[in-house]
Curated annotation (Swiss-Prot):
Entry superkingdom: Eukaryota
Compositional bias per record (Low complexity), positions renumbered to this chain: 134-150, 172-226, 234-245
Gene Ontology biological-process annotations: cytoplasmic translation
Protein name: Large ribosomal subunit protein eL29
Sequence positions bearing Phosphoserine: S31
PANTHER family from the UniProt entry: 60S RIBOSOMAL PROTEIN L29 (PTHR12884:SF18)
Composition bias, Basic residues: 1-26
Residues with the N6-methyllysine modification: K5
Keyword terms, alphabetized: Acetylation, Cytoplasm, Methylation, Phosphoprotein, Repeat, Ribonucleoprotein, Ribosomal protein
Function, in words: Component of the large ribosomal subunit. The ribosome is a large ribonucleoprotein complex responsible for the synthesis of proteins in the cell.
Subunit text: Component of the large ribosomal subunit.
Location of region: Disordered: 1-33, 114-245
Source species of the chain: Oryctolagus cuniculus
Amino acid sequence: MAKSKNHTTHNQSRKWHRNGIKKPRSQRYESLKGVDPKFLRNMRFAKKHNKKGLKKMQANNAKAMAARAEAIKALVKPKEVKPTIPKGVSRKLHRLAYIAHPKLGRRARARIARGLRLSRPQTKAKAKTEPQIKGKVKAQIKAQAQAQIKSKGKGKAQAETKPKAQAETKPKAQAQAKPKAQAQGKPKAQAQGKPKAQAQAKPKAQAQAKPKAQAQTKPKAQATPAAPVPAQAPPKGAQPPAKAP
């Protein structure tokens, strides 16, 4: 009896359109597009009939599973989960979520990174300048100590020279100050002495003038002869005074 053309085990794709036979698995599912269809078909028959080639089938099966997984990874694209900023959270968490957002926080992250970059060289520069600063401080301390020693020596020299200079300058200063003081004191003394002298001279002049005037008037009064007194007539019956012998 002749075999039916509809049940051939090889090259079934010729009669798909006529007999309604299913496509092999490799063509039936998109996930198995890259797998060899012959391998899948043979593996199916080996499960049922070929017990001798079980080890070979297992090895091939492992290869097929690995290829299938790779094909699935390549074909199936994972859906991108759009990040959302939660609402009704505290301000701090809201800010952190904004910075972590891939699109919205791009500028914020760039600004933070820039600030970090700018701050790093400053710390390095500080570390470099620390020994320089220490050297400068040491030099300043040495200079101050030397200046103090010099100032002490100058102070001693000045203390020794001061009495000499004062002894030399005192007579000069006195000699220069005397004519100046006399020149300044004369008009002041004259201006002050005039009213005092006048006030003192007035009572003295008056006191001297009074006795002089009295002394001049007294001798004048004495010098003038007294007027003659008329002689009184003797009373009647009275005897005249006797004449001296």
